[in-house]
UniProtKB/Swiss-Prot annotation:
Binding site for dCTP: 107-112, 131-133, 152, 166, 176
Pathway connected to this protein: Pyrimidine metabolism; dUMP biosynthesis; dUMP from dCTP (dUTP route): step 1/2
Record field: catalytic activity: dCTP + H2O + H(+) = dUTP + NH4(+)
The keyword Nucleotide-binding is assigned to this record: yes
Species of the source: Paramagnetospirillum magneticum (strain ATCC 700264 / AMB-1) (Magnetospirillum magneticum)
Name of the protein in its database record: dCTP deaminase
CDD domains, per database record: trimeric_dUTPase (cd07557)
Annotated SUPFAM superfamilies: dUTPase-like
Oligomeric form and interacting partners: Homotrimer.
Amino acid sequence: MSVMPDTWIREMAKTKGMIEPFTEKQQRAGVISYGVSSYGYDARVSREFKIFTNVDSAVVDPKSFSPNSLVDRETDICVIPPNSFALARTVEYFRIPRDVLVICLGKSTYARCGIIVNVTPLEPEWEGHVTLEFSNTTPLPAKIYAGEGACQFIFLKGDTVCETSYADRSGKYQGQQGVTLPRL
């Protein structure tokens, strides 16, 4: 597998719609950076958030996740309670080629503040808005800024095309739009 450079990312976004909307050059002035970097793409977080709350003293169960545990917010700044988390989504819609696997890493700006971003890999031929999970590991409230960088996607091109893609097996998160809760 090869890590793909900025030139390839730019070409795939422009000719194949791999990332829409696409920011061709990294934006950094007064914001948490986003756009193309040397070997990745820094995606932005949208204004759509679901913030975890323990109002109903719920148990978190990935097999039977209760939306009652979340409070919906559309805002420019999301405040995550101490030792809690929020779900969000990327501004960008991704269409992953059949011979590419994408991994995601959190932004160091957030990590240095105790905020961890988690995303599972984007599999070959998956498409949709990426649901992001922000964990506030601190004992204080933490801010997430909509419209700014949230995480970096690294594109790994396989030496051969996979036999079965995410689309082939009708993956449960295919084509997701908006913040998407766990599904079985």
